[in-house]
Amino acid sequence: MASPQGGYPPQEGYGQPAGYGSPTQQHAGMAAGAPPQGHAGGKKKRAYAGEAFEIGSGANAALGGQLPAGGSYGAYPPQPQAAGYQQPVYGADPSQMNAAAPGYAAPATPGVAQMTQQFGAMGVTDPHLMPPQPPQAAVAPQAPRPVPLNQLYPTDLLTQPFNVAELDYPPPPIVLPPGTSVYPSPTANCPPKYVRSTLNAVPTTHSLLKKSKLPFALVIQPYASLRDAEDPIPVIPDQVISRCRRCRSYINPFVTFLDHGHRWRCNMCNLTNDVPQAFDWDAALQKPADRSLRPDLNHAVVEFVAPQEYMVRPPQPLVYLFLIDVSYASVTNGLLATSARCIKESLDRIPNADRRTRLGFIAVDSSLHYFSIPRDGSENSDPRMLVISDLDEPFLPIPGDLLVTLSECRENIETFLDKLQEMFQNTQNNGCAMGSALRAGYKLIAPVGGKMTVLSSSLPNVGHGSLTMREDKKVLGTSKESSLLQTANSFYKSFAVECSKAQVSVDMFLFSSQYQDVASLSNLPRYTGGQTYFYPGWNAARGEDAIKFAREFSDYLSSEIGLEAVLRVRATTGLRMNTFYGNFFNRSSDLCAFPAFPRDQAYVVEVAIDETVTKPIVCLQTAVLHTTCNGERRIRVLTLALPTTQNLADVYASADQQAIATYFSHKAVERVLSSGLEPAREALQAKAVELLSTYRKELAGGSVSGGGLQFPANLRGLPVLFLAMIKNLGLRKSAQIPTDMRSAALCLLSTLPLPLLIQYIYPKMYSLHDMPDNAGLPDEQTGEIVLPPPINLSSERIVPYGLYLIDDGQTQFLWVGRDAVPQLLLDVFGLPDRSQLRVGKQNLPELDNDFNQRVRAVIEKSRDHRSKGVGSIVVPHLYVVKEDGEPGLRLWAQTMLVEDRADQSVSLVQWMGSLREKV
């Protein structure tokens, strides 16, 4: 996408009631020099639509014929025009919003005045929300009253409906008073890709928070990529770590220096602390250093190299123990051969900079098969297999030789992996003693800690933690279904806690065409900082299945993980961390323990206001103490400063709808597992009603003019996100969803980083047959592939001759309309006739024409996690769907259209109507 002009919000911010989808804004945008979409196409594009319909009547067409925003509900506002790429509404291009600060050019001087007028005086020190300039530059002279916060812009949800483009806006700006940070650094406040608050203006009292009915929580994603090199942050190597004596907060950009710089006042608890003697000394150059250049005083996100006192024991090596299912199911679907080959091909990618990384292998059927792998250069290079059949008390036959150093045994590990498939290729064994294998693996790696990676195609049916086939199609869609989402065997929770205490993390890779009890197995990752990766109906004979797993597993093995990690959040006096959500073990009231700290998950922390806050700002500081893959103990510190307010309107105007939706996603999963599906769905609807009622009563004067439904512009997508959550695979009422699919969806709803979670709840849909001329091509400024504008998830948006991409981040659908013209099919699929088009899982052919290349570029770009500022190993499958093709596949794709009515659920129009009645 194009970079924002000047990097700061255009005049049409979240304000200007006309700003949402109004024709004036759209035409003004076009006049700004962007080609109007739909009409700007070359001859090819005209042909796609022109043979059957009038040109430019598709979803990306210009305004002609569409109702303006003031139309009745269901008449959507026009989708954003191509102009939106040059100068997006409210803030900045979302793809740029998380870019490193140097990516922004300094804004031209004109325009600052407009910005001041629009947002009030902004002393914002976050480069991702404001231009990089000294905070004082855009600030009005200090008045007795604090800096004005974000303005509240009321909208009517019925006459100005939600537009999907709003989900790409950055959160409401964090407006801090001038001079808040010790140095005027543009990176002093935490960027939203690491930490987002549900409220960017914090109520000073518990009673005001309670009155608002809004949650106060942080969405924390300490890492924005799988590898440090992809998202570098300042590292402070001198081991001079200055912390508050009382509250143990780390020195940060929001402290104040006293006594000629010899002491500093903590911005959390106000205690005065001494500045360490070495704080202003450059140990490398052996000379005094300039304090104003220290990263910990200029950057909200830093990493300290930790000295000895931060270690319970010396840093342990990275250990991967693979527990591989070798039963009949795993051999016949190709899992054994594919995983062995994939591990072999990824050995160079496994982090091993300190050459201490160790690997071990246990094969599992109704017995446990250990493998002793000799060092390279030994007389006998063949691996030895030792079989243990006692599943109740599995012992380690030769503990010393079962975990081997990758650097010392590299060749023999490869030899072993080459032979593994042959060893079991004729098996008829249907047993799977995975619970006993986990116990044995625990005994093997508990002394050092590490990761147990489970690859299984079977239900564990013998030994410890054995499970039975309990799925009953008759209870799906009934109140009894929720019991299937609970753990069937207490072993999985109690064993997970044991693992956590011994610094052992478990990741599950599950592949099955049969019931596998994901609900029970997913407890192991849930309490050990791991993840559950689910591949339903997987078979290596399908090339797409084999390639997807190979790419994901290779990325998984190459990810840099933190070991022996703990996470703690500290805050200004008066605030307390109340509840923590995510995959970890809560070791004490405020300490989360992670045997391994993953790079592809986010966490939610609910904040309570225990005492009245008297300061103009509050600070919340997240610290992750961990050992890197290279054996270095480090502390990653993320400091977020937020303004406080006594005014309910400020709280609502600064609320972040995506962070709020993320919080309620975690709450909903918790509710499903404790009370059931129906209570979780009802709680979401009740919350939507409560928020709308509160806003109407407290801020809209209690009256409803003309039967509307008032809500602030910055929260307009929230009711839609709640509906989309209720209709998500994990929560929706349906008798068609297999229990394993539902359980896997609940794992995603409680772990995905915010951008991926929002996309999983409300997928992206792009119209491809009439996409703008620049879509699918690299942007001139950034070199990034330009995506077409997203469109609302409604069948009203789909024309019968169209081609659409629907992408929820886990699965992609390429929807081919029943009247798609032959030229489109020829250009995209290389097929002259629609009847030859194969539906289902596939990859698009690489054809030598411009349109095919652009469509493939859009599909690939839509999969690109790094551009969203998150780490993820997932490579979505692409399913080709014909509108009049295979009914099951078509219905599955249509469940993504969350604004439509489908499978026992209401449409968006009905949902808004029911909210209106209840409010």
From Swiss-Prot:
A Gene Ontology annotation in the biological process aspect, one of them, is: intracellular protein transport
- Tell me the membrane topology, using the record's own terms: Peripheral membrane protein
Q: Which residues bind Zn(2+)?
A: C244, C247, C266, C269
Report the GO molecular function annotations: SNARE binding; zinc ion binding
Q: Where in the cell is it found?
A: Cytoplasm; Cytoplasmic vesicle, COPII-coated vesicle membrane; Endoplasmic reticulum membrane; Golgi apparatus membrane
Q: Which UniProt keywords apply?
A: Cytoplasm, Cytoplasmic vesicle, Endoplasmic reticulum, ER-Golgi transport, Golgi apparatus, Membrane, Metal-binding, Protein transport, Transport, Zinc
A GO term from the CC aspect: COPII vesicle coat
Q: Region (Disordered): which ranges?
A: 1-46
Q: Which Pfam families match?
A: Gelsolin, Sec23_BS, Sec23_helical, Sec23_trunk, zf-Sec23_Sec24
Compositionally biased intervals (Low complexity): 1-38
Q: Could you tell me which InterPro entries the record lists for this protein?
A: ADF-H/Gelsolin-like_dom_sf, Gelsolin-like_dom, Gelsolin-like_dom_sf, Sec23/24_helical_dom, Sec23/24_helical_dom_sf, Sec23/24_trunk_dom, Sec23_24_beta_S, SEC23_SEC24_subfamily
Q: Where is this region: Zinc finger-like?
A: 244-269
Q: What is its main location?
A: cytoplasm
- Family classification: Belongs to the SEC23/SEC24 family. SEC24 subfamily.
Q: Which PANTHER family match?
A: SEC24-RELATED PROTEIN, SECRETORY 24AB, ISOFORM A
What is the role of this chain? Answer: Component of the coat protein complex II (COPII) which promotes the formation of transport vesicles from the endoplasmic reticulum (ER). The coat has two main functions, the physical deformation of the endoplasmic reticulum membrane into vesicles and the selection of cargo molecules.
Subunit structure, briefly? Answer: The COPII coat is composed of at least 5 proteins: the sec23/24 complex, the sec13/31 complex, and the protein sar1. Golgi apparatus membrane; Peripheral membrane protein; Cytoplasmic side.
Protein name, UniProt field: Protein transport protein SEC24
Tell me which species this is from: Neosartorya fischeri (strain ATCC 1020 / DSM 3700 / CBS 544.65 / FGSC A1164 / JCM 1740 / NRRL 181 / WB 181) (Aspergillus fischerianus)
Origin organism lineage: Eukaryota, Fungi, Dikarya, Ascomycota, Pezizomycotina
Question: Which gene is this protein's source?
Answer: sec24
